Each structure stands twice: as C-alpha cells, then as structure tokens.
C-alpha cells in the first residue's frame, strides 16, 4: 500500500513538472496554426497595475499585429490587437530624435488610435489633428510645417479650421483671412465673455450687422491653395439665413432652422476661396470656418495667446461632444507652458491639478481620441556665469508635465530635450531660428521643431 502511494505521488509530481515546463515554451506556429504560450500560474500572479507609477520612469506602447480591421470615418473605431512594448525614457529614433512616451497604451486615449488611423488612411476619409497651444504656435508657426510634412506623406488639402476673426490674420501666411462686422469674445479676454457660449477654440463671435468671413487659399505650404469643401460652425436658436460664395460666384442661400445644438453648413467644390455672409441670424453664435480636403490629413491650429491651457476646461462638455460628432479628431495635441514657467519655480502642484482636470474634461468629451501633451520648450536667461542657460523652473515644469501625462494616461513628447535641452533656445536664436527674447521661435525654428516632431510620430507609425 505504501509503495502505491509513493508511485502515485511521483506520478503527480512528474506531471506537474512537465506542465510547469510547458508554461515556459513561447508561442510558435506549425503551418498556419499558432500555438500560444500557456501560463498555468497566471491566476496566482498579482498585476502591478501598469507602468504609470513605475519608479524607473518606463512607459509602454502598443504595435499593431497587422490585423485587417476596416476603419471608417467615425468617432468609434475598432482597433486590432496590440502587443506591449516598453519604451525607456530618453530613447531615440534612428534619426536621433527623442521618442514619444505613451502612458496610455491600454487606454483609448493613448497614441495607438492615432497611429492606427494614419496606417489605415487609405480606408479613412480624413485623419484630423487639433493642435492646441499658446503664442508658441500662433500664426501656424510649427503647425504649418508639421501639416506640410504630414501632407507630403499622407495627402490632404486646405488649412483646416480658422476662427471667424483672428489676432494673427495679418501675419499668418498659410491662409488669406478677411472678415468684417463681428463682435469677438475669447476666454482670455474676460470683458463680456460668456463661458457657456464658447466653442472648440474657446472663442465665439456674434453678428454686428452684415457680418462676413472669407478664406482664400495660400501657396505658402503643401496643398493649401485649394480645398474640396468648406464648413461654417454656429448655433442659431432661431431661424437664420446664411449665404456662401465659392470662388466669387453668385451667393447660395442656406435656410437654417433654429436649434440649441451645434449646427454647420458644408459646401463642396474646387474651392480656391470661400465667403460666408450672415443675411439674417438673430442672436446666433458663430465659431469658425474651414477649408478641408475630403481625404488625407487635416491639422487645425487652435492657439490662444497668453494661455496656460486651463481655459479649455471652461468649454461646456456638451459643446465639445457636439464638435466631436461634427468634426471628430483622431489626435488632440496640447502644448502649453510658456505662461506657466517661473524662473526659479520648482513646485507646480497647483498647475498639475488644474491641467489634469483640463485633460480629463477633454477626454470625457472625446472618448475615442488620442491625446498627446507636448512639454514646454526651452526658455533661457543669462546666468551668473555670463552664459545663456535654461531657467531652472523650465526643467521642473517639464517633469511636472510628464507626470501629468502619466496620471492622465496619454502620450507625452519632451520638446525641451528634443530641441537640445539646456541653452537650446539661445542656440536656435544664434542660428536665426528664434527671437532674442529666448522664448519664442520663428517660422524657421518652427520648421526645425516640426521636423523633429514628425520624425518622432513617423517612428511610431513605421515600427
């Protein structure tokens, strides 16, 4: 009897050892059949909860496995399965550019959705990007060059979304913008501003009598001289009449029924110029007009001078949700910090709290959109050694912004390091790429940074 018990014990032990060894065999294929790894201890293992709080600063991203999911032009996209890949901080692309850190690989708001959309652009009508920022990008500096690079690879037409009126229309070269007879309101200009009325760019405009806005294509960029369609976005609570004129042709009148929700009119054609005129629109609120292609990349510059980025939290979520349906974005980029960084400031806890709330507000309204936080750029001062160095507060802010991206589960790109780190803005100024305030870049500098950003994006697309 004792001998039988021993035999039984050794048999069970042998089977257990064999099964345990099987769990170490990696997945393999025989013909077209794939055999996956079996982990017999998986139910006993405790998950570490992801990489967001990993003390060594690593993050993770996914690469698609070549699945054949068909992507349509809608806010809900079914993505293929992804494999987890760890990215170390400071890792470079083959061209030497700082890579994008993705802290949301297992969330819908990580970079994967945008990367997948670019890969499937032939099956998708448009891939849209909203690029929010402060004066660092106003006038389409940086964003204009990034749009050009993406257009050369993925196609597209037109300048995208333009506010009804603009502070930068006099020096923006990517579109010719005329307007008249409007009352303008912005989140950073408190006088008379009603936060409940603002739109996607934290602005709104009302008719002061026979108002009009006109966009004309530009040759200062890739495929900016014409578009396939133009849209005007507004809310008119009572019936209204709005007219459109393509390329100076006779007006077409559009009869609008009153509604509390976001409305839009779209006209199509070979559009070199578009003029929208308000014939009758009592109490209507207007937001912006577009020149877009029917295919390829659309990049909207949504800059707000003197902003920290907090103002975006004030945009009503319902209005954002309506824009998500009418003009869904595959990627929303947030680049702020010039108006936050203090020379010697080290504690950015209040900023972090406010910015996290802002990003979560946007994520709630755009649940199927990828988000990326771009760090503050270098900002220099003359130190005690007589040389130009980065303000200490900038370095602390970059780390705070990385922590924001980690907590929000979105992508992060370290622009400060990518452009060269300490003293890099002064170095760019010496090369004629930045202003002597050692804070703002010019169009030449914008082109350089756009090339770096494009390289970082394309590495994620191609790997």
Task: Name each region found by the language model.
Residues 125-133, 138, 142, 296-386, ...:
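Conserved, compact domain cores that house catalytic/ligand-binding motifs in diverse enzymes
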Residues 31, 316-317, 378-463:
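Catalytic His-Asp segment of secreted/periplasmic serine-dependent ester chemistry enzymes
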Residues 67, 71-175, 442-443:
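Long, contiguous interaction/targeting segments characteristic
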């Amino acid at each position: 009897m004792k001998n039988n018990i021993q035999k039984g014990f050794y048999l069970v032990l042998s089977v257990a050892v064999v099964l345990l060894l099987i769990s170490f065999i990696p997945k393999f294929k025989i013909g077209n059949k794939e055999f996956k790894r079996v982990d017999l201890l998986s139910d006993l293992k405790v998950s570490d909860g992801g990489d967001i709080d990993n003390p060594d600063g690593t993050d993770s991203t996914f690469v698609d496995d070549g699945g054949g999911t068909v992507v349509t032009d809608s806010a809900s996209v079914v993505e293929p399965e992804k494999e987890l890949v760890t990215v170390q901080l400071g890792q470079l692309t083959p061209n030497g550019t700082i890579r994008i850190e993705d802290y949301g690989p297992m969330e819908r708001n990580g970079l994967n959705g945008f990367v997948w959309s670019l890969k499937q652009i032939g099956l998708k009508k448009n891939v849209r990007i909203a690029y929010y920022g402060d004066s660092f990008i106003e006038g389409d500096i940086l964003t204009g060059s990034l749009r050009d690079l993406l257009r050369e690879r993925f196609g597209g037409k037109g300048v995208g979304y333009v506010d009804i009126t603009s502070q930068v229309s006099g020096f923006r070269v990517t579109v010719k913008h005329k307007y008249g007879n409007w009352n303008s309101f912005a989140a950073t200009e408190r006088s008379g501003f009603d936060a409940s009325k603002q739109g996607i760019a934290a602005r709104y405009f009302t008719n002061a009598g026979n108002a009009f806005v006109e966009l004309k294509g530009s040759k200062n960029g890739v495929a900016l001289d014409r578009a396939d369609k133009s849209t005007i976005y507004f809310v008119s609570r009572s019936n209204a009449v709005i007219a459109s004129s393509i390329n100076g042709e006779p007006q077409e009148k559009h009869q609008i029924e009153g509604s509390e929700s976001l409305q839009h009119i779209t006209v199509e054609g070979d559009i070199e110029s578009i003029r929208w005129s308000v014939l009758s629109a009592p109490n209507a609120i207007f937001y912006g007009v577009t020149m877009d292609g029917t295919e390829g990349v659309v990049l909207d510059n949504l800059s707000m001078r003197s902003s920290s980025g907090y103002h975006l939290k004030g945009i009503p979520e319902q209005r954002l949700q309506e824009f998500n349906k009418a003009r869904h974005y595959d990627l929303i980029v947030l680049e702020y910090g010039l108006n936050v960084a203090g020379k010697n400031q080290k504690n950015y806890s209040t900023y972090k709290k406010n910015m996290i709330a802002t990003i979560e507000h946007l994520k709630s309204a755009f649940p199927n959109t990828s988000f990326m936080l771009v760090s503050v750029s270098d900002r220099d001062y003359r130190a005690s050694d007589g040389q130009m160095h980065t303000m200490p507060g900038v370095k602390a802010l970059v780390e705070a912004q990385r922590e924001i991206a980690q907590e929000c589960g979105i992508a992060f790109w370290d622009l400060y390091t990518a452009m060269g780190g300490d003293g890099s803005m002064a170095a760019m100024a010496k090369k004629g790429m930045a202003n002597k305030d050692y804070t703002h870049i010019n169009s030449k500098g914008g082109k350089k940074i756009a090339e770096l950003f494009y390289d970082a994006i394309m590495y994620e697309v191609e790997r």
